[in-house]
Structures are given as C-alpha cells and as structure tokens.
Amino acid sequence: MANSETVSETMTDERSSVSEPENQHESQPVKPVDIRRSAMDLLARREHSRLELSRKLHKRFSHYETIETVLDQLVQDQLLSEKRFTEAYVSYRKRAGFGPVKIASELRERGINDVLADKFLHQNSEDWRASAAAAKQKKFGDIAAIDVKEKLRQHRFLLYRGFRRHDFEDII
C-alpha cells in the first residue's frame, strides 16, 4: 500500500513541476512583420483564400486588426488573390474527380463568392461530362450498369461526387 502511495505522489510531483508552455504571442507584442512572414510562409506552400488565411493567422496571433491590415496589404501587393485561389482550387478538385456542385460548395466554405466560383466552374462546362466519365471509370471500371440496382449505385456515387444529372446521364 505504501508503495502505491509513493508512485502516486511521484506522478503528482512530476506533473506539477512541468510548466505549461506559454503562448508566446500573448506575452510578447506582435509585430505586423511577424504576421506577414507567417502569412507569406503559408502562401508559399499553396494559394489560400482570404478567409482561410485569416483563420490560420488567428490561430497563431490574437491581434485581429493587425491581421486584417496585413491581409489588406497582401491583396494590394497581389500576393493574396481570390481569383488565383479559385482557379487553382477548381483545377485541383476537378482533377481529383469532383463535380461542379461539390466544388462550388467547398469554395463557399472557403469564403469565395458564387459569382467568382461560377466563372471558373462554367469556363469549360463540356469538360464536366468527361470528368464524370473518368470518375465513374476509376470507381467502377468497365462494368456496365445492367440492372437497376447497379445504375442507382453509380448514380448515387456521381451525385455524391458533385456532378449534375445531365453531366452523367448518358454514361451510366
């Protein structure tokens, strides 16, 4: 019994001696250059929407006004562009086998307005049929949908992927 008390006391002592890491951003004044550097690091990896970048910076820094000022400057310097982000995102998701409905929904979640999203989603609207056919081919291979059950299964899959009925009616 005494041995278990000793182990318990030792564990308690170890926990109390380990200090919690302090949030360095709250204890030190944040400089706009630090926020800009962090934003540039994120933008160097891939394009971001303003909303995405803002969310990521707010996780690191607590100064709302400074973050917004830095974001405004990045837009003015053409380093942050909703248009470039939208174009890259549509291309990326289309190559991954997703349709226009799902991509539009994801863009809305990332703060992109519908007008800008529609511009890139409907640039090559005839390509969506080919994308739907490729997604179907990848998932189901050359299996022809002979019975109704298989047709419905393929239909549900393509709808889930964000394709519209008229994009895939003739390929099922």
PLM regions and their residue ranges:
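An alpha-helical, amphipathic repeat domain used for nucleic-acid recognition
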Residues: M1-I172
